[in-house]
């Protein structure tokens, strides 16, 4: 029975190994998955974690990011508590090696931010409830298993803004002496690791089998 279970696990790993990780010219591993942390998000009052998955047979990927607002340094001293979720779809330009998760890209995004905070002007607890549709452009670098993602973008925002204009995923225009609650800006850096999800699971199961 134990040999049968081991055989099934090995076969499953062989089937999914090629889908989660391939080799390109020069024998370099081409990972299809990554998990990332938004660099410096903690100092602005939140912790952001992202998962990205390359799509098979296409220079595209899907990316989902979740943010816990309040898990970080209280930059504006207003005790924010809430969350942000965002989804982006990357369209990569072709490059010389065509790693699935590397290269220049364009990314349309949808973001929703919801949190309560202490409003300095009213002295009450207020709600910031905002959504945004953005277009971003950036570059993602992959080195072995390590990944760095840099981007900047802008788009249309809607909802009930906070007095700081910062929504832990995008910021409303409030520079040059002007404010615009419908113009959202986004720019940041994400750092992370690439991996093969099925191969990692396969190894973990084998290690925990009884001997």
Where do the PLM segments sit?
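Gram-negative (and chloroplast) outer-membrane scaffold detector with strong preference
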Residues: 53-146
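Short loop/turn motifs that connect adjacent beta-strands in outer-membrane beta-barrel proteins
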Residues: 21-31, 56-59, 94-103, 142-148, ...
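Residue-level signature of outer-membrane beta-barrel architecture
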Residues: 41, 53, 91-93, 139-141, ...
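Membrane-embedded beta-strands of outer-membrane beta-barrel proteins
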Residues: 49, 87, 135-137, 152, ...
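Outer-membrane beta-barrel "beta-signal"
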Residues: 86, 181-205, 210-211
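Sec-dependent N-terminal signal peptides
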Residues: 4-14
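Outer-membrane beta-barrel pore domains and translocons
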Residues: 40-42, 65-69, 109-113, 153-159, ...
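Residues that define the transmembrane beta-barrel architecture of outer-membrane proteins
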Residues: 29-33, 43-47, 79-85, 102, ...
